[in-house]
């Protein structure tokens, strides 16, 4: 297949991030300069974001059989780039106190972002697998970046071994699907899997194994066991990337697969997904109740949020509102998670050993960092789905599509899960306003709001509030991604 200039324009974000990887690699080889390499990474990610405007002008097109660039791909590419940009921004002050090599951190984040962009554009099971591996392999190193801390090293080893096992399930599942259908393209799968073929045992086994592999990457029950330990052990900026860019990119490609290939038409697969969604919502929220570590709490919380999103995915066959629900929910989840993990990153910067992730570290934060406490409160309220926040809009959409698809027991699970979640989110928020302990623990720098990370956190809080009151602009952007499918 010939690559035309139009194709190159469509691939601009991928090409720009790839070029940034090469430039940063050469810069590290030439001379180690933390500020220079951080700046190059941020410039590259910003340039990739700006290039989305030119991609939009080029229109929807297939670029090789592996990728399709359209409104859907642009939306998820934008979300991945925003998460990657925030990760680099939070990482800079954290790395200032880190005595080992700092520069490779940005290189690994950029390579993982490259995998996320590939997933957003994937239109083939081969590009899906390549994208997942490209996003996973750098994360093995990022999770263990604070390798002198036993907890970080343990988390990295655990994530590496379990991720390798999940990838083998995913790859074997793809092989079974190919053996039955004769093609790996999403569109071809949609054409070849009609007339009751989805009930073939070999095909069901293949999709079942793919669900195991993808369920691990998305931290869905019962493939979630790595999540709390890895979130806790990873440096705070890495937990930010794990919770946002990684999950958004993988969920986006799963959604595209469901749109083109009628996987959800199989009653057996729908039942399995419904059980996974129900278990993820209830178990994730129940396990978060007893947590006193904020990163572990947010890890269990992410399990329940992916369960909510799975409800919209199961309801996908009932209409376009499910696509809208996923887009709005993921945007709300992105900004809320960036704000929450951003506060943890600011409190943990510069690197001084373990992160400030104990709930005790945030007790009475309001009395000496009032704006930071207010930001954390807004994020907790949004994650809980309280009205006047973007999290509420996303959760309302999920409930609406659940009702529309008559998924009554899953709607009930969303309501019960949200009620349980309200308790532990408010527990974090209330602790911020209690009397500060006599011997205060870690604290954010006094001028945190003037740092790049502080600005990102403040913008995230502002977006959560503004889009929670007036979500029409976000809904319009999400709808623009839909007609180009």
Curated annotation (Swiss-Prot):
It catalyses: a quinone + NADH + 5 H(+)(in) = a quinol + NAD(+) + 4 H(+)(out). GO terms for molecular function: NADH dehydrogenase (ubiquinone) activity; NADH:ubiquinone reductase (non-electrogenic) activity; quinone binding. One of its GO terms (biological process) is ATP synthesis coupled electron transport. The keyword Repeat does not apply. Disulfide bonds: none annotated. The keyword Transport applies. It is found in: Cell inner membrane. GO terms for cellular component: plasma membrane. Its EC number is 7.1.1.-. Keywords: Cell inner membrane, Cell membrane, Membrane, NAD, Quinone, Translocase, Transmembrane, Transmembrane helix, Transport, Ubiquinone. HAMAP family: NDH1_NuoN_1. NDH-1 is composed of 13 different subunits. Subunits NuoA, H, J, K, L, M, N constitute the membrane sector of the complex. NDH-1 shuttles electrons from NADH, via FMN and iron-sulfur (Fe-S) centers, to quinones in the respiratory chain. The immediate electron acceptor for the enzyme in this species is believed to be ubiquinone. Couples the redox reaction to proton translocation (for every two electrons transferred, four hydrogen ions are translocated across the cytoplasmic membrane), and thus conserves the redox energy in a proton gradient. This is NADH-quinone oxidoreductase subunit N. It comes from Shigella boydii serotype 4 (strain Sb227). The lineage of its organism: Bacteria, Pseudomonadati, Pseudomonadota, Gammaproteobacteria, Enterobacterales.
